[in-house]
From Swiss-Prot:
Pfam family, one: tRNA_U5-meth_tr
Family from the record: Belongs to the class I-like SAM-binding methyltransferase superfamily. RNA M5U methyltransferase family. RlmC subfamily.
Active site: C334
Keyword terms: 4Fe-4S, Iron, Iron-sulfur, Metal-binding, Methyltransferase, rRNA processing, S-adenosyl-L-methionine, Transferase
Enzyme Commission designation: 2.1.1.189
Protein name (Swiss-Prot/TrEMBL): 23S rRNA (uracil(747)-C(5))-methyltransferase RlmC
Reactions catalysed according to its record: uridine(747) in 23S rRNA + S-adenosyl-L-methionine = 5-methyluridine(747) in 23S rRNA + S-adenosyl-L-homocysteine + H(+)
Keyword Transferase attached: yes
Length: 375
């Protein structure tokens, strides 16, 4: 992938950009095999990759510069701002949005937040695009609601320029820390969720719900999990750390009982909406802590699917699963180091199948799907 920002030394986020994709995949596979070297693996499936540029469905832009000449991108460690509107990881459809947002920031008087001076209002611009219909969700992360009335007043102009903006919100993040969002979300549009569709499964994206940033590879990840589950004798499963329900909604059949657990209530609202659209009445999604939910249950289903954050599922949940011993565990991980650590805590299971998904090209990161079977 060619990147003028990298060539000019202005951005180093894609540390592996100089390596061809096949070399990147080989290095990631070697890393994964090294992490799982202590465990016999019955089947290594071929790694899955997608496009090497223009694949991201989301931009998280730090806003800096002045209100008349805002920069959208990042801050270097020394505080120097860098405009990343031309980053080749973004699809071409993002360029007109960035181009319209810069004059809009001036129109609405949204002074960029200055970290050194602790002054200004606009901290971040968060943009998400649906692959299904090209609709977009735009979030303005502000320090306070001081500029809210001005923003609302200027909004018709932005809608005129960018009719693809289906959901627009203001998020209030008052803390002087590098935290992307606060708890308060103010909707400026009637529509509150972005419609997405992977493999004919309707999915919804709300402002404070996690959604994979590489849709081409994520849709293959969900489809693979579905195929693996269909090969197993499963009538009842848990989907822990389920997010908007991507895994559970793909894996469920009309006669299957499924419980999806996720701490974020916004994500659970999305999952419930999708289940209703699919007419799946035996799916139950609840906004709870996954570990607390599981460890409070007196029995387990045949299959437990886990998709934890980078820290992994942790010892308490590993101990519970070791004791209760479901027949199958499917572990989807964005951090193979913590997954390997967790598998070490599950001695009663063997690894039947592993597959790497190159969700983050040009970096050392990857996603991995693992099928564990009770010995």
């Amino acid at each position: 992938m060619q990147c003028a920002l990298y060539d000019a030394g202005r951005c180093r986020s894609c540390q592996w950009i100089m390596q061809p994709i096949p070399e990147q995949l080989s290095a990631k596979t070697a890393d994964l095999k090294n992490l799982l070297a202590d465990f016999p693996v019955e089947e290594w499936c071929a790694p899955v990759s997608g496009p090497e540029q223009g694949f991201r469905n989301k931009a998280k832009m730090v806003v800096s510069g002045s209100v008349e000449k805002p920069l959208l991108g990042m801050l270097h460690r020394d505080g120097t701002p860098e405009d990343l509107c031309d980053c080749p990881l973004y699809p071409a459809s993002f360029a007109p949005v960035f181009a319209a947002l810069k004059p809009f920031i001036a129109r609405a008087g949204l002074t960029p937040y200055n970290v050194a001076r602790k002054r200004g209002e606009l901290k971040y611009i968060l943009l998400t695009e649906s692959q299904s219909d090209g609709g977009m969700m735009l979030r303005f992360v502000l320090r306070s609601d001081t500029k809210l009335a001005q923003l609302r007043k200027a909004l018709p102009w932005l809608h005129e320029q960018l009719p693809q903006l289906k959901v627009i919100t203001v998020n209030i993040q008052p803390v002087h820390m590098a935290i992307m969002e606060g708890e308060t979300e103010i909707y400026l549009t009637e529509q509150q969720a972005l419609a997405e569709r992977f493999n004919d499964v309707p999915l919804w994206i709300r402002p404070q719900s996690f959604f994979q940033t590489n849709p081409a590879v994520a849709s293959q990840l969900y489809a693979t999990a579905r195929d693996w589950v269909r090969q197993l004798p499963v009538k009842h499963m848990w989907d822990l750390f389920c997010g908007v329900g991507g895994f559970g909604l793909h894996c469920a059949t009309p006669d299957m009982q499924l419980t999806g657990i996720e701490i974020a209530s916004e994500a659970i609202a999305c999952a419930k909406q999708s289940a209703a659209e699919l007419g799946l009445t035996r799916l139950q999604f609840q906004a709870l802590d996954s570990t607390q939910f599981a460890t409070a249950q007196g029995d387990v289903p045949e299959l437990v699917l886990v998709n934890p954050p980078r820290r992994g599922i942790g010892k308490p949940l590993c101990d519970y699963l070791s004791t209760m011993a479901p027949r199958f565990i499917i572990y989807s991980s964005c951090n193979a180091q913590t997954m390997a650590k967790d598998i070490r805590e599950l001695p009663g299971f063997r690894i039947e199948r592993v597959q790497l998904f190159d969700m983050f090209p040009h970096t050392a990161h990857y996603e991995v799907l693992t099928l564990l079977v009770k010995q």
